[in-house]
Amino acid sequence: MERYLPTGNEMISLPKLNEQTAAIEDLTFLSMQQRGMIELCGTENVPLMQPFIQIDQEELALTGLQWSREHFWIPSGHKETEQATVKFTVLTPVGERGFAMRLSVTARTDCRLKLGARGLWSKSVHCVNEEKELTGQAYIYESAWNSSFIMDYRVGFPAFALAPMSDHAGKSEWAQTEDGISYQISCALDAKAGQEEAFTIFWGLGFEEVAAATSAKEQLRRGWDWLYRKTADWLDKRTVQLPTPELTEVYNVNQFFCLFYATGRTFDTEELICATSRSTRYYVSAAYWDRDSLLWAFPTILRADAALAKEVLTYVFTRQRQNIGVHSRFIDGTMLEPGFELDELVAPVLALQAYRSKTRDEAFLQERFVQDGLSLILARLREARHPDTALYETFLQPTDDEIVHPYLTYDNVLVWRALQLLADWRPAQRGSLLAEADAVRAAIFTHCVKKDADGQPYFAWSVDLAGHHDVYDEPPGSLQLLPYYGFCERTDVIWQNTVRMIRSADYKFSFAGKPIAEIGCPHAPWPWVLSLCNSLLCGHAEQALRELTIMPMDNGIACESVDADTGECTTGSAFATCAGFLCHALLTACKEGSSCGTI
């Protein structure tokens, strides 16, 4: 399996920086007008961007670089050869509409260097879960704006453009063929033994020629050192130190992946959006889920950047408000996949409470658009309530798969908590909302608690109020999280019996006894990373921390599920919102004093 080192900023994502070849295989950015993500690609044999180094006219293979993530986010590979020490670094500067790639060489003898990048822009793709190739026309041409070439795409008018500028006078070459647009940017340098020589290419993105070229020029004027320092300072300010280097790396790599891949700004309207992932390697990329963004990613976003968290909530209660509780949506808020999901309906309430608790920003709660959103949530809750019993139905489960029975215990626990919060925020309705919350709690214990063959009580996964129920659990919305949401204590016998059942080797989707002893489900029948998160939050942290130290996941980044023996990714690579929940669960477990090193 290919190993990638994704990086990116608010505007640009580079999901496929290949460790083995040092190639940048694709580049993505968000478009509000197109309701999703645009990806620029090379081919299987010729990447979009390939750095190269020639020493005395002999090309040095950039395979097998030793890679690191500087400041837990900036990919940098180095290599020692008989001729030189070489380094390749990719920087996606915060606040910039572009990125930079830098090659540096310290030769062992005096020599002639040629440093640069070449590549092929073969196609452009629209991505929202599925990929559809665009049918406009790509162009490349010389421009006085950057003293090099501009690559742009037109659909009768400009759609987007990409422009390079370099910190050394060099040579730009290009050609347009049936395979696409090929190009090369290079400079020649005379190197002295032991003296570092470097070449940086700044790439700018824009709507058209001038916007792209000046985005590159802005970076050039600032310079590599300034951009690097600004970005490193931004990353360092948000870096969290955990008791061991291994856990510190897991946390921070996944934190920055969440911040930059679960949120982003559209290049055309510059609006903040939330998405499952800005990587096309995730199978439902560039779309919005309330659950994913607000229950999983939001806690980590909030800890890292309260201002960003406020912007996320503003996006949710404005752009996304009309379809809160609907399965999935485009980034502009319109419906993508229909289907009512109860946990998603109340997710904004839980995220809003987390924000209030962290910031004490009571004024935000009183914003008209927030109040309108809360009123809409209450109205939709009323529609989902059973006419006689205080339980609320859903059509889809937390995996987005169809229900067996309509009343999910986990979902109704979230409703109970949301009603409590809404009662605090709405004094005029406080009495009725608290009464309803109490009624939901009572209904859960009356209708959702069953007994096993030995007469021991447990929480059913779902019920139909006609005597039927199922014993089941889903990592995206687990019964293990009931104490986490405050519904019961970890000492509660019913909850303990429930957890024992679903973690037992007798349970169909349990991987008890395996190195990764987590839980799966039919949606992905392998151990889920979200299950590991649940373990961190429900009193099984020591086991989960041991697993985490041996799980490669997706080259260190959270994925949907992993192999039970190796911990390698099996499904759902580059799962950005899950990365956020992993960070939140890990930090919570550390604060609770779980053992792994000295926590």
Model-derived features with residue positions:
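Extended ligand-binding clefts on enzyme/binding-domain cores
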Residues: 287-290, 376-379, 386-387, 405-414, ...
